[in-house]
């Protein structure tokens, strides 16, 4: 059994390229079905897609990295060569190590951030719903979650970390003297917007509003913060009312365009606007950043802010890597053992067939009036002969060196490793 992974993340690919490979959670099931149908042996598969990474994990009898890469490139509308220039490919122990590091927050833009673990669990559930999970990937991810839990409870990896949402508040505080005097608009109602709204609400802004495609979901989030709710369609006409705009939706196209922002600035008489686009692909057209009085930040722009305290946690990183190393070794040991499962199943089936045949024979003997002692003797002798026949035949076949190797194997299996005395004496002479 082989395990492989490939992907691209904030370390290897720019934001706009990552945006081509972003999948909403409700897209994962059909996407996985398409992936598996495109591969010859339909391996187990899981797809993880966040604002900072898109990764595919597969497990199958044979490694199919090249075909997986070609499928992903086609799905994103780019050439395989372009994707390879920005992607990473990992196999077996390296794939397992990467999964464990991702789950533990060691590969995140925000070192030790906990959100990635929930995102991985969502990805696993989606793969299960798609019928794409099997024993191997189930083990890989359950062990990833266990390792992540141990890392978080045994180390200080998450101490003093700054989330994207907290970084947005910090940057807003550098632009506005008092966050209590501003009006904040949140576009979307997902987990990232929930976190951002929580952090901004702690600063008691003058007003908060949530614009979302689904009013029900928007109202549910808004009720926690005493915020106003509006439809996405109302956003262009009301954009000028807000000093800060935080956006993170699953839209595949920008929902805040250059023209809308230009009109908002004009109505604001060019009072500055703070905008954070946490979405991948982008929610806000990149040209907006060129406007005077607009301070637009993307997830990649926030990277330097969230690095605060990273150096002071290098000891925790080293401790986490030790835990991860042990987890990788245990997983690879389990994976190696899995290679023997088909043979074990065949041996059990063969032994059951022999047993069934001897029982049939014994019943016939009993029906003919044979004594129980004689029937038991015949049955046990028959089973013994069947079990030893193959080994006996191999011991008489081949040249001397092959017979000696066979003798060692047979003694290990049937004599607990003790070589017969005659064979030992021949070896000593």
Swiss-Prot record:
Belongs to the glutamyl-tRNA reductase family. It comes from the Bacteria. This is Glutamyl-tRNA reductase. The gene is hemA. Pathway: Porphyrin-containing compound metabolism; protoporphyrin-IX biosynthesis; 5-aminolevulinate from L-glutamyl-tRNA(Glu): step 1/2. It comes from Polaromonas naphthalenivorans (strain CJ2). Substrate binds at residues 50-53, 108, 113-115, 119. During catalysis, the active site Cys acts as a nucleophile attacking the alpha-carbonyl group of tRNA-bound glutamate with the formation of a thioester intermediate between enzyme and glutamate, and the concomitant release of tRNA(Glu). The thioester intermediate is finally reduced by direct hydride transfer from NADPH, to form the product GSA. InterPro entries: 4pyrrol_synth_GluRdtase, 4pyrrol_synth_GluRdtase_dimer, 4pyrrol_synth_GluRdtase_N, GluRdtase_CS, GluRdtase_dimer_dom_sf, GluRdtase_N_sf, NAD(P)-bd_dom_sf, Shikm_DH/Glu-tRNA_Rdtase. Gene3D superfamilies: Glutamyl-tRNA reductase, N-terminal domain (3.30.460.30), NAD(P)-binding Rossmann-like Domain (3.40.50.720). The active site is at residue 51. It holds the Pfam family Shikimate_DH. Its EC number is 1.2.1.70. The record marks 98 as: Important for activity. One of its GO terms (biological process) is protoporphyrinogen IX biosynthetic process from glutamate.
